[in-house]
């Protein structure tokens, strides 16, 4: 929280996109420490700043609505609202620029983990399949970590045909070191 607050304090003249980013970081940090009111206040600040930024026009390659929805998802998750986190992550995926393949793989895998957490195995498998579509085209340790996690989460469900099909497909795509 202190780092996020320090970054925001060091940028008093930042533009609305940067303010949205910083408020999103502060919201996530506050949520991680259990400060619900502060987290929600910072999310509102981030949304307001993003509205101002979007009214000025699109800025490819900077903090955008997909990033804001990612932060909203993280805050909701940290505050125990898994369904709300899933909705925000789905919205993030919907508005993310197609060139952000690495983030798409990681965030879709995270979305699948959350879908599984609330018992939606079929939806999780569909989302993991989408993540695997892009996975061979990225090089990312964090994406690898998500694929490794996927294998572990799927193992208890391998009697389910959908889960087994996903597991088998992933084994043909992922490096053997991630399957162990």
Per-region residue spans from a language model:
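Conserved binding/catalytic microenvironments
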Residues: 1-180
